Amino acid sequence: MRLDRLTSKFQLALADAQSLALGRDNQFIEPLHLMSALLNQDGGTVRPLLTSAGINVARLRSDIEQALGRLPQVEGTGGDVQPSNELVRVLNLCDKLAQKRSDKFISSELFVLAVLEDRGTLTDMLKAAGATVAIIDKAIETMRGGDKVDDQGAEDQRQALKKFTIDLTERAEQGKLDPVIGRDEEIRRTIQVLQRRTKNNPVLIGEPGVGKTAIVEGLAQRIVNGEVPEGLKHKRVLSLDMGSLIAGAKYRGEFEERLKGVLNDLSKQEGSVILFIDELHTMVGAGKGDGAMDAGNMLKPALARGELHCVGATTLDEYRQYIEKDAALERRFQKVYVAEPTVEDTIAILRGLKERYELHHHVQITDPAIVAAATLSHRYISDRQLPDKAIDLIDEAGSSIRMQMDSKPESLDRLERRIIQLKLEQQALKKESDDASKKRLEMLNTELEQKEREYSELEEEWKAEKASLTGTQNIKTELEQAKITLEQARRVGDLARMSELQYGTIPELEKQLAAATALEGKTMKLLRNRVTEIEVAEVLARWTGIPVSRMLKSERDKLLRMEQDLHQRVIGQDEAVEAVSNAIRRSRAGLSDPNRPIGSFLFLGPTGVGKTELCKALATFLFDSDDAMVRIDMSEFMEKHSVSRLVGAPPGYVGYEEGGYLTEAVRRRPYSVILLDEVEKAHPDVFNILLQVLDDGRLTDGQGRTVDFRNTVVIMTSNLGSDLIQEHFGQMNYSEMKTVVMDVVSHHFRPEFINRIDEVVVFHPLGRAHLASIANIQLERLYKRLEERGYEVKITQPALEFLGEAGFDPVYGARPLKRAIQQEIENPLAQQILSGKLIPGIPVTLDVENGHIIAKQ
């Protein structure tokens, strides 16, 4: 008999049988070896065949293993094994059976039939396990479905639907699918398209995360519950698993063979199956090699003839990129657009999913948490879609509470650390013999006893609370299972089981759950098992860096005294500090316009008066770091062509992939202070970009992504009108000076730009009185640097006044002061430190002598 007439699976099994015989030192390959190999083969057909025929496979395996152990072992043959006469006879019988069935190739299931028609040890074992020729013959007919074995890969194509699809209706029956809330319009539209005579293939298109897959799951649940028109009743929804279809298809044509097997199986089902292809665009080009046909082209004939009932799902971008390019494939599908649900719909969806997440995380999700998840995610996460982002928020909040429940409470942890500390001290004191140590040891023992008693009481309480939570969880799991069983009983019409569950089991479990939950609420001291809006806000704050969590009293106090904090760094600019503080307070109190930035300001004034310093102080106040400020020097954007660097180069230009200078910074940190320094030096086209930011709080970058600026503070600084400020300082009050400066500003900037800014703030020139305070701030930084090297420095009042005089320049503001400190203090100090005149550890005093500042110890 020619071995190339065996199917590829049968050939592999024969090779495995040879390896088995070699490994066991048997001289011949017996039918037992081949049967063992066939039963252990991955993706083989013999094991499923025997199982479907009702044969006891476990017993058969055990008998074969024992028989193999009894076979004679021969050593020193040098790895030479031959097929036994019995195996050759059985294989010839297989050939005869294949010819009788008009098969071109011999498939592995015929081996079972041949063994039963033969006589031998294996025949007796099969019969003992319950196999007969008639039973196996019938099982083979059922499995083949009337097909002939016409090619070597025929066995791989068999049961293709079972191998390469997931039965969603079966999962719906078992209650494994999440409930689908709302989306009635989309499900109805999908059913409507499926009911058509031709082109009855809907494709669900929408943004990622809006619930396209959920709609198909909802359809499967409706079919199971019988809530569909007559034409769709008793149909099955199968989801095509593209991963397993492509995985392992090493040779050319293997993928097409598998897909053909799926399509053949579908055509045999005669319209009783709806095939769901998630990520439909993956079918276009899938399996396409040199001259090979891709999956999309193989689907076209089946779709056109109506043999294939298909539901696709893909995103808008991928539909445009892949499906629309292939007009022949596109016309065979009917589009069903899935829009993002509203916040109200999302709240309803979350309420429906609540029980599943409570069961998974073993927590209780409150209704305010659900409302907060929908509203906060809608407002603060702009680059993702509802309901996906809201579900993720609830999921992660539940996960964080579960983590806290599983770890030791903080109070217990603190006590444990204290006990360890006391025990260490006790061991040390035991070695001492003086009276003071003995007295301390007695006190220590008393404290240790008390702490250990406290610890054991707390631990008992913690364990009791955990046990109570576990009990509640078990009741919830039982209740969920009872509801699923009730649904299954309703479908099959088992009235006795339904009444037992509906009027007996479920009410009893609900009563137990209510009692356990009430008890839980009274007794819980150490553990938290409730997800509230606070946890949801904390998760969102961790994701985005935007502080949306409820303000603690300490933060409220901090916001109320914000001006004092900012004045510690910015001297003398009361109007500017007040304007910025009010904007931040409005935002944190939730009163600011949700569609605009927190605040947008134009700071005007001479150089060196604190415009940039105020931005740094604000960034430090909000984020505890100067680095949280996005600083863009607008003098870099003087040319027209450099404007595109802010939002990123357009498609086709170099640097398109890199994104924009401004947009990327804000996309990564949506909550930040943006400083546009020296804004009047920028090209006028820059202001066209800024109009969108200041008015709508959004900007579209070069790649078409919308960047959210609603949680940023936009500050622009400019020197416009600084000469007028210098000129009229002291002669005019603040409002008059602002009017004069605004005349200059309105000539330089367009009205629509000025109109969108929240406030234009004019900074005053600095007076002599201000410079002494600024000198103190600058010197504090110097003192810190010297402290690190072991020097303690103080300055006398005359020296401070001398510095103020030396650094005063009404034109240049506070910057000359920095130079004065460098020349008068830092330079002499550096020389004295290096020459060894100043000794670390001895205080240093800075004083004035002969018109110079000197350091004395």
Curated annotation (Swiss-Prot):
Disulfide bridges in this chain: none
Any Pfam family hit: AAA_2
Spans annotated as C-terminal: 766-857
TM ranges: none
Region (NBD2), start-end ranges: 555-765
Clp R domain mapped to chain residues: 3-146
Annotated ATP 2 binding sites: G605, P606, T607, G608, V609, G610, K611, T612
GO biological process: cellular response to heat; protein refolding
CDD domains: AAA, RecA-like_ClpB_Hsp104-like
Identification of the protein by name: Chaperone protein ClpB
Originating organism: Yersinia pestis
Species lineage: Bacteria, Pseudomonadati, Pseudomonadota, Gammaproteobacteria, Enterobacterales
Gene expressing this chain: clpB
